[in-house]
Amino acid sequence: MSVTDCFTQINSFTQINHFTETHRYVGRFAPSPSGDLHFGSLIAALGSYLQARSQQGRWLVRIEDIDPPREIPGAASRILAQLEHYGLYWDGDVVYQSQHHARYREILQQLQQQGMSYYCTCTRSRIQQLGGRYDGYCRTRNLSADNAAQRLRQTTPVFHFHDKLRGNLYADKTLAQEDFIIHRRDGLFAYNLAVVIDDNDQGITEIVRGADLIEPTVRQISLYQQLDYAIPTYVHLPLVLNTEGNKLSKQNHAPALPDSDPRPVLLAALQFLNQPLPENGQEMTLSALLAWSVAHWSLNIVPLQAAINTSTFTSAFSKGPW
């Protein structure tokens, strides 16, 4: 099911329990070490960086290394080196999710003790036969943790949320009401659990990321509510597509960002985000180019539609999905 199958825009919605204006802005970039950063990764990193710096906020980096089978040795250090090469320097220490297992287990135990989660032995094939959405079969079976996943008992489904770029988005009801997995059967911590705990613990006030993560947002907000955490605001940036119209990704073998002069690539990224460009951008120092971009950053003019990127980093745009 695509993102556009699960979400539509609506005209009115007021989100409760957000951080207030008195909180200092804290943003983040949270890549997984499954490969080097590519142009699509740069769009998310640059967009979140400019949004944070334009509000005199902090910009944190977190390595989401909770899925070892998908990780590539050395990718985390290369990602950090790439960010530095492109002038995107972060605040504070880099956080690694692999160091937070005890914290995740603490919250899992809390949810279980409070009756807010339960164990489930349903297989992926069974759920696929149901159309891809879990039906709550194990909700009242009182199963043990043996060879079982742990699911959130959904009590606060979120049917819509506000995106600062896209407006108000409405989720498919079956997605919003699903008891989703927070601890996998194979013992790994689910992405939705880890990201909510870490964003809360790091004091993240706004999440700026790619539009491919619109769908999990309602699940994450529901978990925020059940844990009584303050909910950050959200911005979902347009995706970069390859020439075949697919999302530029590590899984689709997107080429790594070049390690040559970063300025032409940054200018292409700014152009992709529909931002104004300095007349002498190629001649500016990297730090001056980024400072100029921070001063002229405007979220309101970022496009909604995905776009095709070419290998020469020109702006070949075409309409596409989020």
From Swiss-Prot:
EC number: 6.1.1.-
A GO term from the CC aspect: cytosol
Cofactor detail note: Binds 1 zinc ion per subunit.
Sequence positions that bind L-glutamate: R28, F29, A30, P31, S32, E64, Y191, R209
Cofactor(s) demanded: Zn(2+)
Motif, 'HIGH' region: chain positions: 31-41
Listed HAMAP family: Glu_Q_tRNA_synth
Protein name: Glutamyl-Q tRNA(Asp) synthetase
Organism: Pectobacterium atrosepticum (strain SCRI 1043 / ATCC BAA-672)
UniProt gene name: gluQ
